[in-house]
Design a protein with these regions (language model features):
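N-terminal helix-turn-helix DNA-binding core of bacterial DNA-binding proteins
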Residues: 39-80
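Canonical helix-turn-helix DNA-binding module
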Residues: 67-111
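N-terminal leader segment of winged-helix/HTH proteins
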Residues: 1-48, 97
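Pre-recognition alpha-helix immediately N-terminal to the DNA-recognition helix
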Residues: 26, 56-60, 121
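Terminal interaction helix/tail motif
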Residues: 128-184
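Charged, amphipathic alpha-helical coiled-coil/dimerization segments
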Residues: 93-147
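Short glycine/proline-centered loop/turn elements that form peptide/ligand docking sites
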Residues: 47-51, 66, 84-87, 91, ...
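Generic structural signal for well-ordered, non-transmembrane alpha-helical segments
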Residues: 28, 32, 117-120, 124, ...
Length: 184
């Protein structure tokens, strides 16, 4: 923990809130660091400027070497911004990395997305560079228990999702309801 960080945030009024705020601050930094890493790795491995979001979709589409529907993609990535997901999918199709296929012969409107040969080459190059840099760096951090950390992140996802569902119940309430919540 970095004790040099100024703890007087508008988000934290007591020790418990400060701990959560410190955690969320690090979470933001991890997210943006991870995104920069993905994009940099992709740029070096494949000379493309795909975004972190597009790369996540590409790797999830290849996952287990089976096609995925838009619903599966959004659920696997915990996303609800279908418009942006569709935009990213179109970019991946345009770049020849994935293709749209009919997923149900009885339903002409049911589509899924699968990786192309070009997409396999792309993700293989990304994987090789990831192994030579990131995996090697992680080997030096023997004290990191990624399995346990993954479990903690899964628990936090559930907490944030519950908080999101709760806040949705207040959407559209009159301002005085929000004021009452602030007092609690």
């Amino acid at each position: 923990m970095n004790n040099l960080v100024n703890k007087t945030w508008h988000l934290a009024k007591n020790e418990e809130e400060t701990k959560l705020t410190d955690f969320e601050f690090q979470l933001w930094r991890v997210f943006y660091g991870f995104t920069r890493w993905q994009e940099g790795c992709e740029k070096v491995a494949n000379q493309t400027d795909l975004t972190g979001s597009e790369l996540s979709l590409l790797h999830i589409i290849r996952m287990k070497d089976r096609s995925k529907t838009i619903n599966e993609l959004t659920r696997l990535l915990n996303r609800d911004d279908n418009f942006n997901v569709n935009y990213s999918i179109q970019k991946l199709i345009k770049n020849g990395l994935i293709r749209k296929i009919l997923s149900d012969k009885n339903n002409k409107k049911a589509f899924s997305y699968e990786i192309t040969e070009e997409g396999i080459k792309n993700t293989d190059a990304y994987t090789a560079l990831r192994q030579s840099i990131l995996i090697e760096l992680l080997k030096k951090k023997k004290e990191l228990n990624l399995e346990k950390f993954t479990d903690v992140l899964s628990e936090l996802i559930a907490i944030y999702e519950e908080a999101d569902r709760t806040v949705l119940t207040y959407m559209g309430d009159k301002p005085e309801v929000s004021k009452k919540l602030k007092k609690q």
